[in-house]
Amino acid sequence: MKVRTRSKIKFDNKAIDKINIDDLDFSFVNKAGEVKFRRQLVFPFDVPNKSILKGLKLCIQKSTGSKLFWLQFWFNGKADYYSVGKRIPGSWGVNEVEDKLLPIVRSHTNDKGHWIKSPVESEKKKALEDQRLIKFYFASSS
């Protein structure tokens, strides 16, 4: 997934809410000189390099106008994205992102801040375990 980034934005609910989808340009000119359109734009946040927020980005979808928090990380020599959540004004914002990321970053990185486990893979494993538990519960109760 090749995604181009834009200028850094402040990690603040007001700064995120100020971004208006109508003001954004999703078009670009490719090497052949044709005008193409992106499905999303990605904006990195202006956060300290040594914080748990390192690699956090705001993804704005063209079709829906949704603002999503993504965490970009390197694991096994490859860049990957973890979807942290969707920005919902008044109920889900920067404080909730910090609360969700703290245990994930602590359990998936070493002392140097290098990723030792992928949060994407961990989430998939947890979902499979939950499905097995639900199947076992309903199979034993009937």
Which residues does each PLM region occupy?
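Basic/aromatic DNA-contact patch characteristic of tyrosine site-specific recombinases
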Residues: 1-139
